[in-house]
């Protein structure tokens, strides 16, 4: 409580309604131009979220766990949490996974801005806590920090908080999400010549030589295929082929899919050749990398948003009203089971999961 009281006093900005409106309009225009400037999003949320935060407060003060949180006002900051100790926890604990996420993406809970425009310390705390718990949301739902993953998490947060800024993010995100994305996945470290002109960015198929970095030369509809890596089980191959052929009419189940985790020396591909109207089994030279191609905007609209809506509705309690600090040394799967948290489906992990 003492820690947040100091934070509240040092961050509170006294503005009238006209001043808040001016800041809100300026921040909204700035968010679209520079979405990575998270403080703009924070200011817009401060000003637009009074009624939503009021409802969250009413919920928490009538909830046993919520009342304790409001009374003690715990924070995910170094004064309250021994972050170095979290690294020493077992690997499947929430605290270890949380630190793993923060370090992978070079983040810290201190980066989350405190609320500025609430006169009430409880309201200010609720919004500040929501921002700090946001990274916990990434961890328990297994979402990375791409635009589409952030938007999916905002869908869950909208259901749990009703904050207007989350709705704005959901509506704007599809226009900011790339139509197409290339992603190189390396078995080992990135080779030193990766950015040099001599690096082999291409593969040779039976029909033409395709520059995989050139959208103009790359005809996506001619290359619906699996990249199959590390597979040595023939039965697995048979099941994989059956899945591929059974789902050809639903390209969402095929495009951009990678199966991995087994041992395969041939690095085989299956493609469908539109010109000859046949399926082709290719044996390519083994490489130390493979190229992952997918459509982030299509994935967001057709898969991530529906999953996020379902996950948000399924959770028995919003994260901000859970005493997360008491769960850091507990098993993350137990946490998910306790609150019916549904993590990202496996088939979306490489695109949107924490890797």
Curated annotation (Swiss-Prot):
The keyword Metal-binding applies. Its EC number is 4.1.1.130. It comes from the Eukaryota. One of its GO terms (biological process) is ubiquinone biosynthetic process. Keywords: Lyase, Membrane, Metal-binding, Mitochondrion, Mitochondrion inner membrane, Ubiquinone biosynthesis, Zinc. Zn(2+) binds at residues 134-135, 138, 150. It is a peripheral membrane protein. Pfam families: Coq4. Its cofactor is Zn(2+). One of its GO terms (cellular component) is extrinsic component of mitochondrial inner membrane. It catalyses: a 4-hydroxy-3-methoxy-5-(all-trans-polyprenyl)benzoate + H(+) = a 2-methoxy-6-(all-trans-polyprenyl)phenol + CO2. Belongs to the COQ4 family. Component of a multi-subunit COQ enzyme complex. This is Ubiquinone biosynthesis protein COQ4 homolog, mitochondrial. It comes from Plasmodium chabaudi chabaudi.
């Amino acid at each position: 409580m003492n820690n947040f009281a100091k934070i509240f006093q040092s961050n509170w900005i006294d503005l009238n309604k006209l001043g808040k409106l001016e800041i809100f309009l300026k921040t909204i225009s700035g968010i679209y131009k520079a979405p990575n400037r998270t403080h703009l999003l924070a200011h817009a949320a401060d000003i637009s979220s009074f009624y939503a935060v009021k409802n969250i407060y009413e919920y928490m003060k009538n909830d046993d766990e919520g009342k304790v949180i409001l009374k003690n006002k715990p924070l995910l900051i170094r004064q309250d949490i021994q972050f170095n100790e979290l690294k020493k926890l077992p690997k499947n604990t929430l605290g270890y996974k949380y630190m793993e996420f923060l370090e992978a993406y070079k983040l810290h809970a201190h980066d989350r801005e405190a609320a500025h425009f609430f006169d009430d310390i409880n309201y200010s705390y609720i919004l500040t806590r929501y921002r700090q718990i946001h990274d916990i949301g990434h961890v328990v739902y297994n979402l990375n920090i791409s635009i589409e993953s952030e938007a999916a998490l905002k869908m869950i947060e909208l259901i749990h908080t009703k904050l207007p800024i989350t709705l704005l993010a959901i509506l704007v995100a599809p226009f900011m999400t790339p139509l197409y994305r290339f992603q190189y996945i390396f078995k080992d470290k990135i080779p030193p010549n990766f950015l040099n002109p001599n690096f082999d960015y291409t593969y040779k198929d039976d029909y033409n030589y395709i520059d995989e970095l050139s959208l103009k030369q790359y005809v996506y509809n001619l290359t619906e295929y699996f990249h199959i890596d590390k597979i040595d089980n023939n039965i697995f191959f048979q099941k994989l082929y059956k899945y591929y052929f059974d789902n050809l009419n639903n390209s969402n189940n095929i495009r951009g899919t990678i199966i991995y985790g087994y041992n395969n020396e041939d690095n085989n591909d299956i493609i469908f050749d539109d010109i000859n109207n046949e399926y082709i089994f290719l044996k390519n030279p083994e490489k130390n990398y493979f190229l992952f191609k997918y459509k982030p905007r299509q994935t967001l609209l057709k898969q991530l948003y529906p999953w996020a809506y379902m996950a948000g509705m399924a959770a028995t309690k919003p994260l901000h009203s859970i005493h997360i600090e008491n769960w850091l040394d507990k098993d993350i799967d137990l946490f998910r089971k306790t609150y019916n948290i549904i993590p990202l489906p496996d088939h979306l992990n490489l695109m949107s999961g924490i890797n």
